[in-house]
Design a protein with these regions (language model features):
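Selective detector of the "anchor" transmembrane alpha-helix that sits immediately C-terminal
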Residues: 237-252
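Hydrophobic core segments of transmembrane alpha-helices in multi-pass, intramembrane catalytic enzymes
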Residues: 12-23, 35, 39, 64-70, ...
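Hydrophobic, glycine- and aromatic-enriched re-entrant/interface helices and adjoining loop segments
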Residues: 38, 43-238, 263-265
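Transmembrane alpha-helix interface/packing and boundary motifs in multi-pass membrane proteins
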Residues: 1-7, 197-203, 231, 282, ...
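Loop-to-helix entry and N-terminal half of a specific, functionally important transmembrane alpha helix
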Residues: 254-295
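A juxtamembrane structural motif centered on a specific transmembrane helix
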Residues: 71-77, 87-102, 283-330
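Interfacial segments of multi-pass membrane proteins
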Residues: 14-34, 127-128, 212-235, 298-304, ...
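Alpha-helical transmembrane segments of multipass membrane proteins
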Residues: 1-3, 20-25, 100
């Protein structure tokens, strides 16, 4: 129904209306056709006759009102079928909350009607997915989650990039995706880091013999970009050895977590492994130019007392939890 409202041409809206006939033939109630007809009417009245005012308050409120009507009908119909089920009550409350939140957001922070439509229809889409076709075909749940997540990401990424991220964040992402070449500005650190790692070759230039690092071409080489020092001085094999040591540490932490009997101890062990893994992945990734530069330390490697203390305390607490398990088993 929301797709009908989002169309810019009447013909496209009628095509989506035709899909409702297929849903009706597959077993949905006749109300689905009524909702489709109502969506067509609202499309013509709100979109076509107020196309000049879509960007301002009047057009936005018209679209929000039209979508709210569609949403309320879709909420009331399934709720009336199962008024006493707990899941129906929860869904009713969440749906009304989403609609009210969308109206409030549109009042204080006007957005394009596409984002309003996606936000107000998200809860209903999930509800229909779980209570309709997916109950008959449980294996499609993962596919539905991926599809819904992809659609939300497509519509939300542009708004987040333009309205949430700061200008310097946007430049870093553009440099990462090769959308903007700035070797002397935002891309300088990554460019020099890749030169240092590439010049190291297989065996490296030797301990303290790196040219890019020792001549200070690579900024922050003691903290955020310390991995490029390893790559330049010790080459591919030295870098691989460091990554293998990290892998052994993560496997050891996971093994400790697997043998814990209490849920909290297991969750804590997995959390420690996740923290170390993401720090390692992001730090090494940004040094190699495959991750945006966000200034994250390499665990137990980067210079800095606070990060060293933080990671050490995480491991100390994990070892103490494991020791308490051994004490209780005696």
């Amino acid at each position: 129904f929301v797709l009908i409202l989002l169309q810019k041409e009447t013909g496209s809206a009628l095509v989506f209306m035709a899909f409702l006939l297929m849903f009706y033939r597959e077993g949905m109630k006749g109300i689905v056709l009524l909702l489709g007809a109502l969506a067509i009417v609202l499309f013509i009245v709100v979109i076509r006759f107020s196309i000049e005012t879509i960007g301002n308050e009047q057009g936005s409120w018209g679209v929000v009102g039209a979508i709210a009507i569609i949403q309320l009908i879709q909420i009331i119909v399934p709720f009336s079928s199962h008024p006493h089920k707990k899941e129906s009550l929860i869904f009713l409350g969440l749906s009304v909350l989403v609609i009210v939140a969308s109206v409030i957001i549109n009042k204080w922070y006007p957005v394009d009607y596409n984002y309003v439509a996606i936000g107000t229809s998200l809860v209903t889409a999930i509800y229909w997915a779980f209570t309709g076709i997916l109950r008959r075909y449980p294996k499609l749940i993962a596919v539905a989650f991926i599809s819904i997540g992809s659609l939300v990401f497509i519509y939300a990424s542009d708004m987040i990039f333009n309205h949430v991220l700061e200008p310097h964040h946007q430049i870093r992402i553009k440099v990462l995706l090769n959308m903007e070449d700035d070797p002397t500005g935002a891309g300088y650190n990554v460019n020099q880091s890749k030169i240092a790692i590439g010049s190291g070759g297989l065996w490296g230039k030797g301990f303290l013999n790196g040219t890019q690092t020792k001549l200070k071409y690579v900024p922050e080489q003691d903290t955020d970009f310390i991995f490029c020092t390893v790559g330049e001085e010790h080459g591919f094999w030295g870098s691989a050895l460091v990554l293998i040591i990290y892998w052994l540490l993560l496997m050891r932490i996971m093994k400790i977590g697997e043998r814990q009997k209490e849920s909290f101890h297991r969750v804590y062990a997995y959390s420690v492994a996740s923290i170390l893994f993401f720090h390692l992945m992001i730090n090494v990734g940004m040094v190699l130019g495959i991750m945006p530069v966000i200034g994250i330390p390499l665990p137990f490697f980067s210079y800095g007392g606070s990060s060293l203390w933080g990671f050490t305390l995480l491991l100390f607490i994990l070892l103490r939890l494991d020791a308490s398990r051994l004490e209780r088993s005696r």
